[in-house]
Amino acid sequence: MMVFAFWKVFLILNCLAGQVNMVQVTIPDTFVNVTVGSNVTLLCLYTTTVTSLEKLSIQWSFFHNKEMEPISIYYSEGGQASAIGQFKDRIIGATNPGNASITILHMQPADSGIYICDVNNPPDFFGKNQGILDVTVLVKPSKPFCSIQGRPEAGHPISLSCLSAFGTPSPVYYWYKIEGNTIVPVKESFNSATGVLDIGNLTNFEKGYYQCTAINSLGNSSCEIDLTSSDPEVGIIIGALVGALTGAAIIICVVYFARNKVKSKQKNLNSSTELEPMTKVHHSRQNEAIPAGGIQLEGTLPSSIHASHNTEPTTAVLEPEYEPNPPLETATQPDPEPEGSGPMPVPETEIQLQPEMELEPETEPEPEPEPEPQPELESELEPDPQSGVIVEPMREEEKETVKA
């Protein structure tokens, strides 16, 4: 208290002596409202006891309502001025003495907040050198968004909501019902600050079109919503339609995959069929010397032997080692004749030969005395390993003749 009293006395004495230097800042309008997109001039006037303005400095600071620390947006000293931050190229400062006002161009909602004007002119260190302004950017309500809470079916409780994303000052909401060409206020209670309309259990009386209007000092905006109680039969029809479409889609998919599978199998079958003729040709060339039905070779004994024995030409039958399919009937061997009756003529057997294959004639052997006939003994000729055939048994007399 003693210090404060001392300074008070000191200032009074200096004023009486005419030696006190002071700066006085005046703010004509501390509350300013401006429409979004328009320009605004923030007035700040000052007085100083120092005649020289060479050291005069003017600074404007701003902080948004949500921020705690002010930021410098404009500074001028010795006639040199500059704008800073989000207001760069948007601020024009006054140049006439005693006027520290600024004009801000194209105001936006984010420009709403507190502005501080600070003036200093050394050696003026006393007085009120600071002024504060509260600026609000007015915004027309944006088009509200209307929505339904609950199931819009008869007997179910529902409510309607309406909300604008932007609007300064905060808009007030009103609900109306559209009946034909007229709009009438709703009878149900609603909250004008939040825009919620509580309808309760929906009946046929409440169904129809509703309109919500958001209003503030700059204008209004509206939205509409169609509130119609749905018929249960409509839900059944929609469900049946969805089920039918789903079933049809499943059937189409099954048919599509089945057809693709059949086409794939047919393609593989065609590929194997194209390779089959080459395989058959290869087998037929290997079997040209050995027909599938069996091979029979015809060999004729020399004519001198036939003449000496007075016999018919003898035929030797060769058959394959394996049993052909279908089996071929072999020539039936005749019953042996009793001794002394002479050699039995061998019946001629037809032998199938390919035209290209012929037996080379053997060298004619010298005739030998005719042996006495003996009982027939069955024997097998050794198969030719190269031809893969079996020689049919011959009579003993024929063997002796061939060996000779």
UniProtKB/Swiss-Prot annotation:
Which sequence positions carry the modification called Phosphoserine? S271, S272
Q: Please state every residue range assigned to the domain named Ig-like C2-type.
A: 141-228
> Would you kindly state one Gene Ontology biological process term found in this protein's UniProt entry?
epithelial cell morphogenesis
Q: Which intervals carry biased composition (Basic and acidic residues)?
A: 393-404
Biased composition range(s): Polar residues: 301-314
Q: Which residues are glycosylated?
A: N39, N201, N220
Ranges for domain Ig-like V-type come to 23-133
- Biased region (Acidic residues) positions are 357-383
- Per the UniProt topology annotation, the Cytoplasmic ranges are 255-404
Q: Which SMART domains match?
A: IG, IGc2
Keywords assigned by UniProt, alphabetized? Disulfide bond, Glycoprotein, Immunoglobulin domain, Membrane, Phosphoprotein, Repeat, Signal, Transmembrane, Transmembrane helix
Disulphide bond pairs: C44-C117, C162-C212
Protein name according to UniProt: V-set and immunoglobulin domain-containing protein 1
Organism, scientific name: Rattus norvegicus
